[in-house]
From Swiss-Prot:
One of its GO terms (cellular component) is plasma membrane. It comes from Oryza sativa subsp. japonica. The keyword Cell membrane applies. Pfam families: Ras. It is found in: Cell membrane. It is a lipid-anchor. This is Ras-related protein RGP1. Signal peptide: none annotated. A motif (Effector region) lies at residues 47-55.
C-alpha cells in the first residue's frame, strides 16, 4: 500500500475518512511535542505542560483517499489519573508514549495499555513509542525491552525524537495507514455483499467519526507488529 503525504490545513476539500487517534502515557514524555511535530511540524523547547482538552488535525492522502487525522492529547489529565472514558471513545488508533530516559515511564506502559484496552475497541491499532531518542547517552530503557513488550502485546513499535523529527512522521503514518487498510478491507467486503435485487451495501464516503459528529458504523482494527 502506498503511503500518502499530508497537508497542514487545506480548506474546502472532500474528506473521505476521519480517524481519531489518542496520545497516552506519563506526563512529560513528550506527547504534546510529538503532536506539534506531526500536526504542524513545530517544536518548542519552552513548551509548558498541556492544560485543557486539546486535539489537532492534519489532512492526509492515502491511496487517493483524503483522510483527516484527528490527534487527541491527554491535556495533562494523566498527572491526576483523570483520563476519562470520553477521551478514548471513538478512537481507532493510539500512540502509547514513554521516555527512553525515564524507566518509570516505561514501567507504567502496561498500566496505560490496560486502561486503553478497557475503554477503547479491543482491536484498536496501537503504536508503542520510545520518545527522546536524541538523548541516547541518557538512555535507561533498552530498545530490546520495548521491542519484546511490543511483540508480546501485538503492538507496533518505534523510537522517535520530536526534537529532531526522527520517525515522528513514520510512527503516525504507520498507524493511520494500518487503520485505512483495515477500513478499506471492511468496505471491500461490504461492497461485495450484493443482495438479490442488485443493491450493494456501498460504504464509499463512510467516515470513522469522533464524538460530536454524525454516527458511523463501528470499526474494528487488528494490530500487528511491523
Amino acid at each position: 500500500m502506498s503511503r500518502g503525504g499530508g497537508s497542514y490545513g487545506e480548506v474546502g476539500q472532500k474528506i473521505d475518512y476521519v480517524f481519531k487517534v489518542v496520545l497516552i502515557g506519563d506526563s512529560a514524555v513528550g506527547k504534546s511535542q510529538l503532536l506539534a511535530r506531526f500536526a504542524r511540524n513545530e517544536f518548542n523547547l519552552d513548551s509548558k505542560a498541556t492544560i485543557g482538552v486539546e486535539f489537532q488535525t492534519r489532512t492526509l492522502h492515502i491511496d487517493a483517499r483524503t483522510v483527516k487525522a484527528q490527534i487527541w492529547d491527554t491535556a495533562g489529565q494523566e498527572r491526576y489519573r483523570a483520563v476519562t472514558s470520553a477521551y478514548y471513545r471513538g478512537a481507532v488508533g493510539a500512540m502509547l508514549v514513554y521516555d527512553i530516559t525515564k524507566r518509570q515511564s516505561f514501567d507504567h506502559v502496561a498500566r496505560w495499555l490496560e486502561e486503553l484496552r478497557g475503554h477503547a475497541d479491543k482491536n484498536i491499532v496501537i503504536m508503542l513509542i520510545g520518545n527522546k531518542s536524541d538523548l541516547g547517552t541518557l538512555r535507561v530503557v533498552p530498545t530490546e525491552d520495548a521491542k519484546e513488550f511490543a511483540e508480546r502485546e501485538n503492538l507496533f513499535f518505534m523510537e522517535t525524537s520530536a526534537l529532531e523529527s526522527t520517525n515522528v512522521e513514520n510512527a503516525f503514518m504507520t498507524v493511520l495507514t494500518e487503520i485505512y487498510r483495515i477500513v478499506s478491507k471492511k468496505n471491500l467486503v461490504a461492497n461485495e455483499e450484493v443482495d438479490s435485487s442488485g443493491n450493494s451495501s456501498l460504504l464509499k464516503g463512510t467516515k470513522i467519526v469522533v464524538p460530536g459528529q454524525e454516527p458511523a458504523p463501528p470499526t474494528k482494527a487488528s494490530c500487528c507488529m511491523s
